[in-house]
Amino acid sequence: MQGDFDRAVELYQGSIALHPTAEAHTFLGWTYNMQGKVPEAIAECNRAIEIDPDFGNPYNDIGAYLIELERYDEAIPWLEQAIAAKRYDPRHFPYFNLGRVYLAKDLLNRARELFRKSLDIEPRYTLARQALENLRRMVN
C-alpha cells in the first residue's frame, strides 16, 4: 500500500510541475495525509488556496487534519471558510467536521445541529447519520 502512495505522490508532483492546479495540490495533500505526513498535507492545501481561494476542498481538509491533531479551535475557521467557499460541491463535509469539533468540545446541541445540517445537504451521508445516532445514545 505504501508503494501506491509513493507512486501517487510522484504522479501528483509531475502533474503539478506541468500544470499546477488547486485540485492537484489538494489531492497531493490527501496522499500525504494518508502517509501520516500531516504538515506536508496542510502545506499542499495552503498552496491550493493560493492558486484558487474560492476552492472549498482544501479549507475543509485543513480543518479535518487539525481535528485529527485535536487542535479543535484552530479547525473551526477553516471549516467555516469551506462552508462559505464559492466553489465547493460536497458542502456536507465541513458541516459534519464542525459537528465533530463541537462534539469533542462537549457542545452537544451544536454538534447535533451540524450533523443534521450535513444530513439535510446529503441524506445518504452515513458518517453523519452514525454520528447523530451515537450522539442520541450519549444523551439518552
Predicted regions, residues:
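Alpha-helical segment of the N-proximal tetratricopeptide repeat
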Residues: M1-E23, F27-W30, M34
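Structural signature of tandem alpha-helical TPR/SEL1-like repeats
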Residues: Q2-L11, Q35-R47, L69-A84, K105-K117, ...
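Structural marker of alpha-solenoid helical repeat scaffolds
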Residues: A17-L18, I51, A85-R87, I121
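TPR alpha-solenoid repeat register
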Residues: A24-H25, P58, H92-P94, A128
